[in-house]
A protein has these predicted regions:
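Substrate-binding cleft of secreted/luminal carbohydrate-active enzymes
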Residues: 33, 38-57, 66-67, 73-153
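A short glycine-/small-residue-rich loop at the edge of a beta-strand within enzyme catalytic domains
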Residues: 23-26, 54-58
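Aromatic-lined carbohydrate-recognition surfaces of secreted/lumenal glycan-active proteins
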Residues: 1-28, 75-84
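Aromatic/hydrophobic pocket-lining residues that form the small-molecule binding cavity
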Residues: 28, 60, 107
C-alpha cells in the first residue's frame, strides 16, 4: 500500500480475497478484519462473493452484509460476482445447487442487494469469457442474465 501511494497517491490499491471469511483467516492466514478496521492497508476490497442466495455455507446476502459490516474505515466495497456459474449446477452450494441453473436474474438481484450496503461502490464480474464468450450450452442463460442485469444498471 505504502509503495503504491508513494509512486502515485491517486492510484487505488485493493485486493480480492475469497468471499468465505473463515477460509481467509484459517486457511489463507490473512487478516482481512485488520485491513478493514485500520488505515493504510487498502482503498478498496473486492471479496469474491461467488455464492448464490441459497448457498448453504455462505448465502449471498448475508455474506455481503458481513463484508460491509467489517469495514470500519474508508475502504470501498466492490463485490465480486460469478457469472461463470450461470446456467450450471453448483455442486458445493448445498440447498442452492440449482440456483444458478434456474436463475435468469440472479446477477441483477445480487447488484440490487449489494447496493443497499453503506460501503458498496460497485461490482466486478469474474471471468470475461464466461460473459462475452460463453460455452454454447449456457449461452441462452447468460444472455438472459445480461438482459436482467442491464435493467438495473
Amino acid at each position: 500500500y505504502t509503495a503504491v501511494k508513494q509512486a502515485d497517491g491517486e492510484v487505488l490499491f485493493g485486493i480480492s480475497p475469497q468471499g468465505n471469511m473463515d477460509n481467509n483467516y484459517n486457511k489463507q492466514f490473512i487478516d482481512v478484519k485488520k485491513w478493514l478496521s485500520e488505515e493504510g492497508y487498502l482503498d478498496y476490497i473486492c471479496p469474491q462473493v461467488y455464492f448464490g442466495f441459497k448457498n448453504s455455507t455462505c448465502p449471498y446476502e448475508q455474506t455481503v452484509e458481513e463484508w460491509n459490516d467489517l469495514i470500519k474505515n474508508k475502504v470501498q466495497l466492490v463485490v465480486g460476482l460469478s457469472p461463470y456459474k450461470v446456467g450450471l449446477e453448483d455442486a458445493y452450494a448445498g440447498n442452492g445447487r440449482w440456483e444458478w441453473a434456474n436463475g435468469g436474474d440472479i446477477l441483477a438481484r445480487m447488484v440490487e442487494t449489494a447496493r443497499k450496503e453503506k460501503h458498496y461502490q460497485g461490482f466486478a464480474l469474474f471471468r470475461y469469457n464466461s460473459v462475452f464468450q460463453p460455452e454454447s450450452s449456457v449461452r441462452p442463460a447468460i444472455l438472459e442474465e445480461l438482459d436482467s442485469l442491464q435493467e438495473v444498471l
